[in-house]
Amino acid sequence: MGVLSEFKAFAVKGNVVDMAVGIIIGAAFGKIVSSFVGDVIMPPIGLLIGGVDFSDLAITLKAAEGSAPAVVLAYGKFIQSVLDFVIVAFAIFMGVKAINRLKREEAVAPTLPPVPTKEEELLGEIRDLLKAQNNRP
């Protein structure tokens, strides 16, 4: 088997395709969460704290000199990234929890014993008759 055919077999496996779809959806979901945190959650929190825009919070370590930019510690962006992570982690947790609950419900669902077919009933009757004949003196 050549390298190209091995790669083709690997690339079209269900797990690889599923993983690629998951990564693409995850990237899009990350953008949605970042927008949600930056545009919906952080402004009211900043307003409650005193009109502070968290993304602008920073400590200047060294002022700008000439053409060299200032060296800053942008902790506001870090706070926003932490909130992004917490929201994404919580959403994933809730999704996994829901999937696990569905799996448990499937496992708990009682399975009824199969109804014997006519042939199985007939074979059972024949078995019982043979046992009865063998037990006679």
From Swiss-Prot:
<dbReference type="InterPro" id="IPR036019">
    <property type="entry name" value="MscL_channel"/>
</dbReference>
<keyword id="KW-0472">Membrane</keyword>
<dbReference type="InterPro" id="IPR037673">
    <property type="entry name" value="MSC/AndL"/>
</dbReference>
<dbReference type="InterPro" id="IPR019823">
    <property type="entry name" value="Mechanosensitive_channel_CS"/>
</dbReference>
<comment type="similarity">
    <text>Belongs to the MscL family.</text>
</comment>
<dbReference type="GO" id="GO:0005886">
    <property type="term" value="C:plasma membrane"/>
</dbReference>
<feature type="transmembrane region" description="Helical">
    <location>
        <begin position="79"/>
        <end position="99"/>
    </location>
</feature>
<keyword id="KW-1003">Cell membrane</keyword>
<keyword id="KW-0812">Transmembrane</keyword>
<dbReference type="GO" id="GO:0008381">
    <property type="term" value="F:mechanosensitive monoatomic ion channel activity"/>
</dbReference>
<keyword id="KW-0813">Transport</keyword>
<comment type="subunit">
    <text>Homopentamer.</text>
</comment>
<protein>
    <recommendedName>
        <fullName>Large-conductance mechanosensitive channel</fullName>
    </recommendedName>
</protein>
<keyword id="KW-0407">Ion channel</keyword>
<dbReference type="Pfam" id="PF01741">
    <property type="entry name" value="MscL"/>
</dbReference>
<comment type="function">
    <text>Channel that opens in response to stretch forces in the membrane lipid bilayer. May participate in the regulation of osmotic pressure changes within the cell.</text>
</comment>
<keyword id="KW-1133">Transmembrane helix</keyword>
<dbReference type="InterPro" id="IPR001185">
    <property type="entry name" value="MS_channel"/>
</dbReference>
<keyword id="KW-0997">Cell inner membrane</keyword>
<keyword id="KW-0406">Ion transport</keyword>
<feature type="transmembrane region" description="Helical">
    <location>
        <begin position="9"/>
        <end position="29"/>
    </location>
</feature>
